[in-house]
Amino acid sequence: MREIVYIQTGQCGNQIGAAFWQTISGEHGLDSNGIYNGSSELQLERMNVYFNEASNNKYVPRAVLVDLEPGTMDAVRAGPFGQLFRPDNFIFGQSSAGNNWAKGHYTEGAELVDQVLDVVRREAEGCDCLQGFQITHSLGGGTGSGMGTLLLSKIREEFPDRMMATFSVVPSPKVSDTVVEPYNATLSVHQLVENSDETFCIDNEALYDICMRTLKLNNPAYGDLNYLVSAVMSGITTCLRFPGQLNSDLRKLAVNMVPFPRLHFFMVGFAPLTSPGAHSFRAVTVPELTQQMFDPKNMMAASDFRNGRYLTCCSIFRGKVAMKEVEDQMRNVQNKNSTYFVEWIPNNIQTALCAIPPRGLKMSSTFIGNSTSIQELFKRVGEQFSAMFRRKAFLHWYTGEGMDEMEFTEAESNMNDLVSEYQQYQEAGIDEEEEYEDEAPMEAEE
């Protein structure tokens, strides 16, 4: 069985994680104590992708919950699914990282990291065939970004051949939670580029937009946002957990989605999203799902793919879906919007089908796109970073924890390189022979 070890770090990571486990437990027919009371054999068949079976039919999430302060953990423990998790897997410090990346990465986080790795090791050793790790964190805070990336590199050292998927909540364009967000995010991206295999970029503002515009919620709470994220996370791993005609897993996803090793930052989307009142007025069909899935308003990261081009993308359909219909729709999308796909990758779209839809829906689809327009996101953070860094604002908080200014400069240039790489492949055409013009006469002489 292809097991996944799930690590949630920081406040944001733990809250998204809590929503995710609620979604997954529901799909597998588990109640809030981890006792199975589902209706279908299929729910049990691959339970152990995310759950360990404990004594007397209790299933326990293979989750490691990490934070540098006990507050969020207590909230998770007191929440509706708090009794689900194994108590040993809660690992928290008492000091908090105070939105400071250096604290999470070098001082406070570094003290806690060995404890976390012990638990991760224990969980990994209990697996038959470990597929990889999923990490949820935000890039704006201290723990999720600093300690999350520290864990990422430590786990990478120890399990170099396992997949690393991160769900990273990136800073929003207009709404900022913390002033030093650009610093924390840039330092994190610097790590993610090197150590992650797939990074799914999510941002709160795009989620708010979806909640207000599509789901028609007047004042969405974080719970609603986390629900959207957990729908996508469930969709991405659905093929591991339920049988389907076309399977995909984290590794297949990476092979099909990452044309160049550094360009592994994806946009995600989910369909069908309808407001509660409008359910009865829409038929959920494959064309309808496809249209909504490729709609820029449905993307959960604030960058518009119409400003760039897709290198690759992947669509995962769930439910009773005809294979042929999906293929026709995908071909249709590529032919109609050919300008949005790079022409030097002929078949950009990977599809996966899974027979079991999410709870309460007949069919659904999850979209993952590797678009060059994600550079907007990094550009935006980079501009904010350089504005602050030029004046060395807030820098003493980081240097006080033992960081060097060089690290900031390195992180900044690494992120700028990433942006220019995306730009380069966005502009690349299929017949670029300009570079070889000087050499042409030589061939003629031969």
Curated annotation (Swiss-Prot):
| Pfam families linked | Tubulin, Tubulin_C
Question: Its biological function?
Answer: Tubulin is the major constituent of microtubules, a cylinder consisting of laterally associated linear protofilaments composed of alpha- and beta-tubulin heterodimers. Microtubules grow by the addition of GTP-tubulin dimers to the microtubule end, where a stabilizing cap forms. Below the cap, tubulin dimers are in GDP-bound state, owing to GTPase activity of alpha-tubulin.
Q: Which GO terms describe its biological process?
A: microtubule-based process
Q: Return the SMART domains for the record.
A: Tubulin, Tubulin_C
Family assignment from sequence similarity: Belongs to the tubulin family.
Q: Which organism is it from?
A: Hypocrea rufa (Trichoderma viride)
Listed A to Z, the keywords are:
Cytoplasm, Cytoskeleton, GTP-binding, Magnesium, Metal-binding, Microtubule, Nucleotide-binding
Q: Cite the source lineage.
A: Eukaryota, Fungi, Dikarya, Ascomycota, Pezizomycotina
Name this protein carries in UniProt: Tubulin beta-2 chain
Q: Which GO terms describe its molecular function?
A: GTP binding; GTPase activity; metal ion binding; structural constituent of cytoskeleton
